[in-house]
Amino acid sequence: MAKPRRKDVGYVLTSRPCTESSLYIDVFCRSFGRVVMVARGARRRQSDFRGKLMAFSPIELRFSGDREIKSLSAVEWLGGRPLPQGRNLILGMGANEIVGKLLPRECPSPRVFDMYDSLARDLSEMPDARPAVRLFEWFVLREMGVAPDLSGDDKGRPIEPGRVYSMAPENLPLRADEPPDPDRLRFRSCLVRGEHLLRLREGRLSASDDEALRSLGRLTGLFLERACESRLRGAAFCDQLDALLRRVEDVRLELGSGRLAAPAWVPAPAPAAGVGQGPRPSSLTAARRMAPPLALRPARAASLRANGAGPGDEPAA
């Protein structure tokens, strides 16, 4: 009896070699959730799968099988958008890691899929997709029941923009100037301004607000680490990249203001055309005179001396 084929749209989260010619792929589907498949022959040059199983590109796929690992039979690329570049690519890889670790296999999550589809589009089109990534991380945490409701603090009072709150997993926001409950001390916490929490709740994040993005990045990273029971590699790499970029910007500003001297290994800028250079030769003979003399054959050198010419001159006609 032929195995029934299923059809769905999805995104490839990760892929790894299975054999010399096949791949294991982890696909996030809208109707079937996260599904692991084997793409037989996908590594061959003549395979119909080549160039279609790329991350962040929507695909329509057909697969079959009753076991844990399904068999991919057909793929249609639904892309038409550029792949993420630079920081956005790293952020997207971190989002794929979150989906792969938090969502169980073959558990439909259409709301998370729609949010991921919007994130994949922002990663390709926006110059800085950090706001979209922070909103996606918090949305997934809320869907998984890990993140708290930001409509009020632990005593039911509204979140105030001018206050600072202590945020800990499995707990509601706590005003930083109030003593914590003893049970709360079992968890790591971080401090977040109420204004940033309100922006996160309302989805009003801006790429120009680095302070809010860094603060909310620490918040989502803390909750994701608790939910995944380990530090996410993508989040750790993004933190290191942000620290490096901030250091590079600080050094650039110090060099520009003259407070910091350039290291000895930094080459001096090249002079402008015509500045500090000798006169331009007007002919081939002049160019040869400016160049260092070359070793000539003995007969050629004797002929030039007999004609009264130097080693860099043309012989007399």
Question: Which role does the model predict for each range below?
Answer:
Residues 1-23, 28-317:
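Non-catalytic alpha-helical scaffolds and adjoining flexible linkers that form interface surfaces
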